Amino acid sequence: MKKLILSFLPFFLFAAAFAQMENPVKWTYSAKKIRGDMYELHMTAVLEPKWHIYSQDISDDGPVPTSFVFDKNPLVKPDGKVTEMGKQEKEYDKNFGMNLKYYGNKVDFVQKIKLKVAVATLVKGKITYMICNDKKCLPPKNVPFSIKIDPRS
C-alpha cells in the first residue's frame, strides 16, 4: 500500500503545482470613504499578461460575464450598480461568434454603498468570473470576498 501511495505522489504534486499555475488573476479588496456615510468598495482584478476577464455586460449566449452577489447586511445600503474602471477592449470573438467586452491587465470593479449606522461591519459576497487568453478559457470561478468598513479609521 505504501509503495502504491508513493508511486502516485509525483502525480499529485504535479497536479497541485499545475492547479496553482492556472490562476492568472489575483483579486484585492478595499473600502474607501468618499464622504460622510458613503463608501466605495473596490474589487480589483490584476491579470497575468495575455489573459482577460469579461465585462459584466455580456449577452446570455456568450461567455460568463463577471458578476457580483452581495450578502445581505442590514447596516449597508447599495447605491447604484457595480461600475467598471479600466481599459475596456471590444473585439469580435470567433469562438463565441459575437462582439465581446473585456479587460486585460487590470480592472477595478466599484460598488458605492451607504453605511446606515456609524459602526464597523463586513461586506461579504462572491464574484463569478471567467478568464481567457488567445488559446483557451478557464472554467468560471466563484470567489468569496469580505471587505471591512470601519468609520473610525
What does each model-identified segment do?
Residues 1-22:
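Bacterial Sec-dependent N-terminal signal peptides
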Residues 18-153:
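Extracellular/lumen-exposed scaffold segments
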